[in-house]
Amino acid sequence: MCGINGIIRFGKEVIKEEINKMNKAIKHRGPDDEGIFIYNFKNYSIGLGHVRLAILDLSEKGHQPMGYNVDEDKIIYRDDELDRADIIIVYNGEIYNYLELKEKFNLETETGTDTEVILKLYNKLGFDCVKEFNGMWAFCIFDKKKGLIFCSRDRLGVKPFYYYWDGNEFIFSSELKGILAVKEINKKENINKDAVELYFALGFIPSPYSIYKNTFKLEARQNLIFDLDKREIRKYYYWELPDYKPIYDKKKLIEEGKKLLYDAVKIRMRSDVPVGAFLSGGLDSSTVVGVMREFTDLSKLHTFSIGFEGKYDETPYIKIVVDYFKTQHHHYYFKERDFEELIDKYSWIYDEPFGDYSGFPTYKVSEMARKFVTVVLSGDGGDEVFGGYMTHLNGYRMDFIRKLPKFLRVVGSKLPVKKDLNGIANLYLLKEAFRLSLINPEEFYAESIKEDAIRPEIYKKWTIEKLRYCLNKGDNKLGEALRIFDLLFNTLCDNFLVKVDRASMLTLWKLEVHF
């Protein structure tokens, strides 16, 4: 949707050309407009930059950086007038419930943007304003009167936020390339060893790590408060997954699930530009398209898909859905030459090691979609919410096995079978299940990979810490914990959501996730 940049520096002024370089580095995220704000105080200097992809209120009133003069109750959206503002924001994302928030808090607004709602709600509620938001966001607010910087990232980390801090400079951007435009950290001695080890174990680098030292990702559901007078940074989680008990009443599950899904799709279709949908042929994206028919004419809806040569092609399933819903469908077959064309571009797109090869077809389908629409709905997150991965099923099986007497599990863990023996693979898996049932549930991931080469200590520490949190939230059931683990830490935030953010921003449109 957009891109944000900024520099906070002590002892030396930020110059406009630096922010201009950062904006240029991520211009692909926002081709419609850009803005810069520079502020020099007695002991610090601030520069903020923004590149815009217009979705809501396409007029100049959506320009950023955007400011708010509290005494005059006036929104300022011209760069040359921002000195009059008390609060200035650069923001990437969308607050879906901004209209409801305007009504709830009696906010008088001058623009049709959700950016203005964030500014005025921050002025009214302070840092707790994010607790009211239903949406995806990464933003930085400069509060002149309080002398602080307030940064925040949405609950699941849909929108990215990278920052560099060395005690003298705080530099942030929507992508690492924004930071690299003004800071020479792309050197061998700056490579973060822990991040490299986590990458080889996970296939991505999880928050708060980045590939470089002193450079971090703001974590999902996290606020960062920077006291500029004290040079102190404080981070905290503004949201925790509520404690809950699983619902086993099928009727109640269907009723609540349907209501939540319909509400999610409806509110994400708010837009002043054309909306389409990805369609993979799977349950998640097909369900989203099915729900969309309640709020739009599907005969005018553009849907997009990718096919492959060979056994992994799901084109027949896609065709079934398209024939049923009668959408305006666009299909592309991903070929070997597409891979060859993109391979050299891959490292530039993702800035740091990223091992999900599905990023290649995601880029191609995004490129195709941009010819027809500006906003695309997808089915990402469905497996994490509904327990759709085999690891989740294995976790539920493990919960059952743990109910067996311990002596039986000990005997089972010593079955004289090996992994490479033909014909008894299921016996080996059963032996492994018995073995894993004897360890603490929080060590499930740390112990399920035996090869030390791809199970470094930092990986063990990271998975144990995250699974412990998930077990506490999941009624101490491993199946529930593994689902929460994927939702909050593993498959979504720094993996799948990174993939779709980079692909969509590079091809200039906004992607919405629903589950």
Swiss-Prot record:
GO terms for biological process: asparagine biosynthetic process; L-asparagine biosynthetic process. Pathway: Amino-acid biosynthesis; L-asparagine biosynthesis; L-asparagine from L-aspartate (L-Gln route): step 1/1. InterPro entries: Asn_synth_AEB, Asn_synthase, ASN_synthetase/amidase, AsnB_N, GATase_2_dom, Ntn_hydrolases_N, Rossmann-like_a/b/a_fold. Keywords: Amino-acid biosynthesis, Asparagine biosynthesis, ATP-binding, Glutamine amidotransferase, Ligase, Nucleotide-binding. It catalyses: L-aspartate + L-glutamine + ATP + H2O = L-asparagine + L-glutamate + AMP + diphosphate + H(+). Its EC number is 6.3.5.4. The keyword Ligase applies. Residues 2-229 form the Glutamine amidotransferase type-2 domain. One of its GO terms (molecular function) is ATP binding. The keyword Ligase applies. The record marks 380 as: Important for beta-aspartyl-AMP intermediate formation. Belongs to the asparagine synthetase family. This is Putative asparagine synthetase [glutamine-hydrolyzing] 2. It comes from Methanocaldococcus jannaschii (strain ATCC 43067 / DSM 2661 / JAL-1 / JCM 10045 / NBRC 100440) (Methanococcus jannaschii).
